[in-house]
């Protein structure tokens, strides 16, 4: 199994966004980044790393034993598909 995270709030992503939008607060820069670069995002924000961790923990647990060979998108609704 694999987890495919979308834009996640990490130190590197925060620095990148601040470099792209200098002079704005971190919150303002993140909002602008999402609005300009991820306008289709259903959650409209960066993903918290703990949210990705929760998914990974579940996929690694015995409760997910029937999930095999899956790619799990955790990207906040950027990709719109119906399986």
What are these regions (language model features)?
Residues 1-9, 60, 73-75:
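Conserved SDR Rossmann-fold cofactor-binding beta-strand/turn motif
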Residues 7, 46, 66:
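Short aromatic/basic micro-patch
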Residues 7-40, 81-83:
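A glycine/serine/threonine-rich, flexible loop-to-helix segment
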Residues 25-26, 40-52, 63:
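A conserved structural motif in NAD(P)-dependent oxidoreductases
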Residues 57, 68-83:
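Short C-terminal tail/terminal secondary-structure segment
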């Amino acid at each position: 199994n694999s987890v495919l995270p979308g834009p996640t709030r990490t130190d590197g992503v925060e620095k990148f966004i601040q470099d792209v939008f200098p002079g704005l607060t971190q919150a303002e820069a993140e909002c602008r980044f999402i609005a300009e670069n991820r306008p289709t995002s259903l959650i409209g924000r960066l993903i918290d790393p703990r949210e990705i961790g929760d998914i990974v923990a579940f996929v690694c647990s015995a409760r997910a034993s029937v999930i095999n060979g899956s790619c799990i998108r955790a990207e906040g609704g950027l990709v719109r598909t119906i399986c």
